[in-house]
């Protein structure tokens, strides 16, 4: 079974790689990139700090990384919101994040209660992942593929289920067991599953950004620069896609007349648009 160090370092390194890749696409002006970059930066910093639980003070080795994880979750949701053309709901998310951080600090320095800490972070992460999935499933303003957005939403929902399972697992445990709770078989399995899902969650924005750039390039190629009307090639491709070729004896004259009439309408629309531009 993987050691805790490997389980934590693999998602951290993945977040670092994703940060570099997203930073290289920063100039594309796709909404949400900046939030996703900072989310992965915080994730890459927070996870290694958890390995120094017994070497550093609790404020640095326990509280700080969890506060960074709370902020990373909020920024991930913000990136998903901006990507589909919506504003993040900060009036709800910001107080929720602040309350979780305050509660987490209380259950470290006032009452040492590990199940309560896990429950706070898991429930908060579940809420933010649900909000991110809801945003990704909405219709975006920009032309994009629905398949990749659905896949990214499915990854978020899968990670949400892992967080819910961890919260349910820790809820009935005895807080007096202390850090032995982290060594239980159930927790180790859930941590491994979460560590496997986290890299996929970090890499989902790269898929979304690349798909958005391809959709914009495809839209630019398929449109006339001056008038914005559909190009002849794009029109022919769309006709062939919606009206598959038929045998000559079955197609008859109706299909050819429909094609010719639509082509004539497209030609007239494009030239009238050019005349308006020229005028």
Outline where the language-model segments fall.
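Juxtamembrane segments at transmembrane-helix boundaries
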Residues: 16-33, 47-181, 198, 204, ...
């Amino acid at each position: 079974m993987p050691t805790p160090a490997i389980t934590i370092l693999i998602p951290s390194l993945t977040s670092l790689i994703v940060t570099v890749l997203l930073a290289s696409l920063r100039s594309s002006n796709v909404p949400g990139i900046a939030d996703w970059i900072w989310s992965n930066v915080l994730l890459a910093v927070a996870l290694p700090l958890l390995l120094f639980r017994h070497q550093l003070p609790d404020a640095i080795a326990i509280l700080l990384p969890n506060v960074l994880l709370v902020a990373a979750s909020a920024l991930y949701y913000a990136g998903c919101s901006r990507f589909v053309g919506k504003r993040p709901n900060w009036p709800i998310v910001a107080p929720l994040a602040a309350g979780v951080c305050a509660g987490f600090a209380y259950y470290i320095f006032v009452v040492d209660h590990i199940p309560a800490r896990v429950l706070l972070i898991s429930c908060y992460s579940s809420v933010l992942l649900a909000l991110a999935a809801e945003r990704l499933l909405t219709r975006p303003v920009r032309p994009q593929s629905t398949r990749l957005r659905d896949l990214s939403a499915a990854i978020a929902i899968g990670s949400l289920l892992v967080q819910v399972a961890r919260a349910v697992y820790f809820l009935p445990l005895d807080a007096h067991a202390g850090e032995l709770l982290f060594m239980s078989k159930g927790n180790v399995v859930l941590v491994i599953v979460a560590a496997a899902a986290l890299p996929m969650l970090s890499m989902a924005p790269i898929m979304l950004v690349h798909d958005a750039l391809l959709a914009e390039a495809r839209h630019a190629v398929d449109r006339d620069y001056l008038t914005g009307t559909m190009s002849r090639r794009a029109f022919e491709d769309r006709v062939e896609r919606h009206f598959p070729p038929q045998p000559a004896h079955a197609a008859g004259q109706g299909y050819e007349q429909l094609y010719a009439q639509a082509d004539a309408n497209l030609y007239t629309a494009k030239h009238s648009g050019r005349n308006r531009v020229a005028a």
